[in-house]
Amino acid sequence: MTRRQIREEIFKLLFERELIDNDIQKRIKEVIEEEKIKKEDQIEFFEEYINGIIENEDILIQRIKDTLDGWTYERLGTLEKVLLKFSFYEIIIKKVGYEIAINEAIEIAKKYSYN
């Protein structure tokens, strides 16, 4: 699996979490098995990102709220909330270049957005 494919799986799991209160650790294991994520570095990336976003969720949401102009966080759609949390996590916590984080978010949005 490529990093982009793993990011998509992270996005889908976080999207699911926004809609359904479920056992996230159980779902992480299921997704790893279902998606055949085999390589240890891929599994580590997948788990680290999901757990990191969840652990830092309050910080990420506050940073998003501080950035929004003319909008409230509550008005954002589920897709937008997940992609923003994901992107903010990559930029702020993981120190991924903003160009990469934004490009990855755009590519996921193109694939999963209805517009």
Stretches found by the model and what they are:
Residues 1-115:
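N-terminal interaction/assembly modules
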